[in-house]
């Protein structure tokens, strides 16, 4: 994944954009998950995350359907994953297919993409946010808040 320059760099309010290599595991899984959600009639899917003190992760996954239609979070979807094996003194990485519930696949995707875009987000004071699949737009958006402790030193002599 690489950061792409925004189209209007003078506008500081415009969010950063990232380009995911479509052949990568994240790129493939994004396509698969969006297609699965669209086929089920979903409007959005959201994975919310929170963490601090060197730990954290996805807390909740929800899918918004039109007119409160049901959505089966336990339905299976085939996605890709990287598997590492230590052989002959070095790590060997392969890409494998795996079947997961849609809920777990969304959770795993969110965990992975947050680590890529906001590496170390859970350290120190941490952060929180949402990974939102917009099925109508065909996009995935991350809304992230970083937490930090601030101090303002002032010295006054009277």
Predicted features and spans:
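Long, hydrophobic N-terminal alpha-helical segment
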Residues: 1-44
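Residue-level detector of intrinsically disordered, flexible termini
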Residues: 9, 44-46, 104, 109
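Alpha-helix boundary/N-cap detector
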Residues: 17-28, 68-71, 97, 101-108
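Short, well-structured hydrophobic secondary-structure segments
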Residues: 28-88
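A short, structured loop/turn motif at beta-sheet edges
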Residues: 37-41, 101-105, 134-140
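Short, hydrophobic/π-rich interface segment
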Residues: 74-124
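Acidic, proline/glycine-rich low-complexity IDRs
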Residues: 122, 127-158
């Amino acid at each position: 994944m690489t950061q792409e320059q925004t189209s209007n760099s003078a506008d500081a309010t415009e969010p950063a954009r990232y380009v995911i290599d479509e052949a990568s595991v994240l790129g493939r899984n994004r396509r698969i998950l969006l297609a699965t959600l669209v086929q089920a009639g979903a409007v959005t899917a959201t994975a919310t995350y929170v963490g601090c003190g060197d730990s954290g992760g996805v807390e909740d996954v929800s899918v918004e359907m039109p007119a409160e239609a049901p959505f089966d979070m336990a339905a299976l979807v085939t996605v890709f994953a990287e598997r590492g094996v230590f052989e002959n003194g070095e790590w060997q990485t392969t890409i494998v297919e795996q079947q997961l519930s849609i809920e777990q696949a969304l959770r795993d995707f969110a965990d992975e993409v947050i680590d890529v875009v906001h590496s170390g987000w859970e350290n120190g004071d941490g952060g929180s946010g949402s990974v939102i699949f917009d099925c109508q737009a065909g996009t995935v958006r991350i809304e992230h808040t970083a937490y930090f402790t601030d101090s303002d030193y002032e010295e006054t002599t009277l």
